[in-house]
């Protein structure tokens, strides 16, 4: 499974397939927090960052 993290409208989002999931992290927070969050929700997934 591939998970893409992306900044949109001031928040980090996870994109899984065609679903866009808003995270509780603002775009000013560290990317490492978002990656840890994604790994906890989707263990074993490949995580990519999109600009």
Residue ranges and their predicted role:
Residues 19-22:
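Short, surface-exposed beta-strand-loop junctions and turns on beta-sheet-rich folds
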Residues 25-46:
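A short, charged, amphipathic alpha-helix used as a generic interaction element across diverse proteins
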Residues 1-16, 48-49:
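Short N-terminal "domain-start" leader segments
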Residues 11-12, 36, 44, 51:
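Intrinsically disordered, low-complexity segments enriched in polar/charged small residues
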């Amino acid at each position: 499974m591939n998970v893409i993290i992306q900044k949109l409208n001031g928040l980090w989002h996870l994109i899984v397939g065609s679903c866009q999931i808003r995270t509780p992290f603002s775009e000013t927070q560290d990317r490492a927090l978002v990656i840890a969050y994604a790994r906890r929700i989707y263990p074993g997934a490949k995580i990519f960052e999109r600009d």
